[in-house]
Amino acid sequence: MRKQQKIHVKIGDNVKIITGFDKNKIGKVSKIDRNTGKIIVKGINFKFKHIKPNAENEVGEIKQFEAPIHHSNVKLN
């Protein structure tokens, strides 16, 4: 079993991204995973998932979602 990491932000905190593609953007923490040390910030770090067509879904689609980022890449604003 993994040891849970101590994270310096809480759900609802406004944070500023300090590294990466979304550097200097500000968002609100919406979810925290203490086992991996990652957080999801609303409106930051969007990724795309391509879904192939299959029997139940006859047309493919592209879904957009917010990917988690490590808590060390943000600071409280």
From Swiss-Prot:
The gene is rpl24. One of two assembly initiator proteins, it binds directly to the 5'-end of the 23S rRNA, where it nucleates assembly of the 50S subunit. SMART domains: KOW. Its main location: plastid. Keywords: Chloroplast, Plastid, Ribonucleoprotein, Ribosomal protein, RNA-binding, rRNA-binding. This is Large ribosomal subunit protein uL24c. Part of the 50S ribosomal subunit. It is found in: Plastid, Chloroplast. SUPFAM superfamilies: Translation proteins SH3-like domain. PROSITE patterns: RIBOSOMAL_L24 (PS01108). Signal peptide: none annotated. InterPro entries: KOW (IPR005824), Rib_uL2_dom2 (IPR014722), Ribosomal_uL24 (IPR003256), Ribosomal_uL24_CS (IPR005825), Ribosomal_uL24_KOW (IPR041988), Translation_prot_SH3-like_sf (IPR008991). Belongs to the universal ribosomal protein uL24 family. GO terms for cellular component: chloroplast; ribonucleoprotein complex; ribosome. GO terms for molecular function: rRNA binding; structural constituent of ribosome. It comes from the Eukaryota. It comes from Trieres chinensis. GO terms for biological process: translation.
